[in-house]
From Swiss-Prot:
Keywords: Methyltransferase, S-adenosyl-L-methionine, Transferase, Ubiquinone biosynthesis
Organism: Colwellia psychrerythraea (strain 34H / ATCC BAA-681) (Vibrio psychroerythus)
Record-given protein name: Ubiquinone biosynthesis O-methyltransferase
Family: Belongs to the methyltransferase superfamily. UbiG/COQ3 family.
Lineage: Bacteria, Pseudomonadati, Pseudomonadota, Gammaproteobacteria, Alteromonadales
PANTHER family with a match to the protein in the record: METHYLTRANSFERASE, UBIQUINONE BIOSYNTHESIS O-METHYLTRANSFERASE, MITOCHONDRIAL
Residues reported to bind S-adenosyl-L-methionine: 40, 70, 91, 135
EC primary class: transferase
Amino acid sequence: MSSQPLNVNEDEIAKFEQVASQWWDLTGDFKPLHQINPLRVQFISQHIALQVEGIDSKNGFYDMQIIDVGCGGGILSESLAKLGANVTGIDMGTEPLNVAKLHALETGVSINYQKITAEEKALENPGTFDVVTCMEMLEHVPDPASVIQACSTLVKPGGLIFFSTLNKSIKSYLLAILAAEKLLKIVPDGTHDHDKFIRPSQLIGWAEEHGLKCIDASGIHYNPITGNHKLNDSLDVNYILCCRKL
């Protein structure tokens, strides 16, 4: 057994444990994740179709091995599994994983959920996955660079990794924390810590250090009135990356 401490923030885990029962409530605390999920799936699907030979998003992702790092209650994991992929979802939250497993049973979707860190999984299954997704997770761990390294280890050469997180900017504080948490109450107060947000240049730098090439960096714009999300060129607040393993 490794004596290295786990790359886990227990306070962050506890926050999501407390609200795990709401994960699949479309009007609850996780409503923003449900609203953003179609855009994430579209972004991932389009890049898989463009970058992976022999794959057409219209025909599904059958036989593809995808791992969803920090899967929580399984919103993205289920969407990818419904497209035909063989999906593994990993998280360190017991209750979110229990919710994810139960919901998968209810919907008849087959997903391999595991309570394990990205680093531990990388030691167990290096170079196993065609695609790795790591959505809205990096800002919740003590060492995001370690997670990026683990994701690079998990993916096959030529495979794709998708990251999404929040930029460490004044605008992200104003919109993601002051507006979304404290004024509009779109997400629970205390969900995010601006000090843990990550500048795109920093994330891309870590990715390159671990053998990844960023092939797309797009901003995600949220309209609080309509609840819709769309991609744009501004990385000021939410952003999503597609990287390829060299």
